[in-house]
């Protein structure tokens, strides 16, 4: 390989670091309607009346839309970016008379500028009938208070949903007789773990610009991971034909799953469609904190059984998930809590995985990197660490005895074959990187501080089997350079670069010879979007196949121009050469072939390929943390984090490494500081980055990432995914290190200094 597995610079790097205008607010007009949302101060209420008379008298105000402008009996929609028919229920209206959380939309205001809209918003008078909210997700199921009592609530997929029970989803699956196996085990770990809701906290908040184009269609320019899904979502919300909607995306200032939900597009789309005037919405940081789509709060009851020799024989997991006021991604995230944690332990004779996803009057949850696997892995990996403690075994050793291996069937992973796996090598690599034998479990530093280590494993997937679709179009232009058209959305991950690397490898050309254009529903080939760790594996494979097809067409036209058969020529990326026959040795360069294709030619130098996969090969990761705990204050200092990742072949080692480092940093925040909490009225407490504590550079210590490459035969050049698996190991690793330092295991995140200090006092 010459281009793949090379640490090449991102194509857009210079534009980003020099501050060029590349984001939504940079590339869209300022002289458009400013759109803002009046939001509910109540967790559960009915809007009795809205008086907008005074507000509309403010100079510059264009329109104020309320529930009276939306058919309350019309078909509902979901904002979840998922393939149709979505697993997420259709439970939203653009503006609903029934508001279901603090921050839900009461009115859409549009005016000439932000100043007049802000003034008008203060003059809108709303009368509410305040209802009792459901705030505790433990009591939501079959609660007499219904979050969605409406008759036009709809579930399109068989996910066990029932709005009359506050159930967004329910599922049960298993293999073997788990109760009999657990009854026969020498040791059973029976614990309940709780993970909090967390914000993605991307730098660029939700934002969308809308206009009516030359053909009278709605053109949406949005910071989104899902242009094709957004087209469907907006069409469903506005009850207009999809042919009337075009969605494009510029650069994205971070997404991490938040922008797999169309959280902002619907509202300016509604304004522009109604007024026929361009409009723009930019969420404030407060709005992105109180009305976005954070990680699902989950509670996991784990029963893990083993023999006294450390062999894990059975895992029983029940997950309760809080989807909040609306069901975006609720039915799908919960599945990963079991199906991306239990399969790590290949020796288990039986498993059972059950789940409930419930509605509450909290902010609607959504997609966040890790997508449910993060929560489940914290629970299962913590249980395995506790098992090691009880048996007096080394946590690395107990995993070496139990892990899945290449070539094994994984019953808890939908019965899929483990086609590529370097998990054993990842374990050995991290064991040495962290110097485990000399540091485990802890060392008293003699100054009131204790240093300790902990570890954990993780897996994820590479796209959604038999569902995700990736496509690529490649064409040859004048002078022989290429254009790569994709529907995947580069949200900082670098897929515009890595997909071009795959094409360049096949076409044997420098990376700069390929121009990447992405994510426009009018001219991009269809792509499900950038989520579910699918882009490299699914769209990357489409790109590889597309480049191979185009290469064949180049050879065919070159052979025609050279007067021989296609089978007689070769192509080295620069020229087509006749290898045999009477014209052997004759050549024609790519530039001349490209020029000839534009004059009297019937062989199109363009190819489009679509790809979907029947398997989703997991990437694997092992992580180990070294921390220092101040036993008096409870402060945790992360000294070192060592990780080894099996993502198959890294297409671009630089981008792969920073993906891993960023994911680890987010996992550190979830473990130690980040949390979405509410007061007893359902009001969110962390409405800014002062209250919501994401880790700064000084908080994450030294992060070291290395790679143990397997080779996935179904992936492009052996590649699997990288984007999500990297967030999962800090939770069990750091929490286990804290246990080793202070002698108490914490079952609820985040583990704050206050919790540790209180535990130390209780111990004394």
Where in this protein do the model-derived segments appear?
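Short acidic, glycine/serine/threonine-rich loops at helix termini
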Residues: 74-79, 120-123, 222, 231-233, ...
